[in-house]
């Protein structure tokens, strides 16, 4: 029987004043549970919920893309033997807009993006179709176990 990975979580919500309803949907225990469900090894992660300006600045600085995106993952582990370490940055207004456009509950979209970002922190990617299909299948399975619907339907 495999053990549950340990998670050290630093939760930051500088966008709380502008997005209090988002913070209310994201209690520490829920965020930690969603991340732990997607962790395959011990992890030390910072999750930061930001506004559009900070999201855009980070995306422009680190990816060369001048717009806010839903989730950015910065993975720091240097080898597979290291604990999973990284920062997940979620942009509240982008997540809210996408959830509305996709007709899904905001909390379900946050859970999906936290699982998605956690997989990125472990080296999963979706740049080529085969990798995207694998990553989407893992996300769908994890979210199903957490009681959320398939995010790709």
Curated annotation (Swiss-Prot):
Top EC class of this enzyme: hydrolase
Protein's cellular compartments: Cytoplasm
Residue pairs linked by disulfide bridges in the UniProt entry: none
Cellular component, GO, one term: cytoplasm
GO molecular function, one term: RNA endonuclease activity
Positions contributing to Zn(2+) binding: 116, 120, 126
Keyword Protein biosynthesis (UniProt): no
Biological process, per Gene Ontology: rRNA processing
Keywords: Cytoplasm, Endonuclease, Hydrolase, Metal-binding, Nuclease, Ribosome biogenesis, rRNA processing, Zinc
Reported cofactor(s): Zn(2+)
Entry superkingdom: Bacteria
Enzyme Commission numbers on file: 3.1.-.-
HAMAP family for this protein: Endoribonucl_YbeY
Assigned protein family: Belongs to the endoribonuclease YbeY family.
Protein name in UniProt: Endoribonuclease YbeY
Gene this protein is translated from: ybeY
């Amino acid at each position: 029987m495999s053990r549950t990975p340990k998670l050290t979580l630093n939760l930051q919500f500088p966008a709380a004043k502008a997005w209090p309803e988002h913070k209310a949907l994201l209690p520490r225990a829920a965020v930690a549970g969603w991340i732990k469900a997607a962790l395959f090894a011990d992890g030390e992660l910072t999750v930061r919920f930001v506004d559009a300006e900070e999201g855009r600045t980070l995306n422009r600085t680190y990816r060369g893309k001048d717009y806010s995106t839903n989730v950015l993952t910065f993975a720091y582990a240097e080898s597979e033997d290291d604990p999973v370490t990284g920062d997940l940055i979620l942009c509240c207004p982008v997540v809210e807009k996408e959830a509305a456009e996709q007709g899904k509950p905001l909390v379900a979209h946050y859970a999906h993006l936290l699982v998605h970002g956690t997989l990125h922190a472990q080296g999963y990617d979706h740049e080529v179709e085969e990798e995207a299909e694998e990553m989407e299948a893992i996300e769908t399975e994890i979210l199903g176990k957490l009681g959320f619907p398939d995010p790709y339907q």
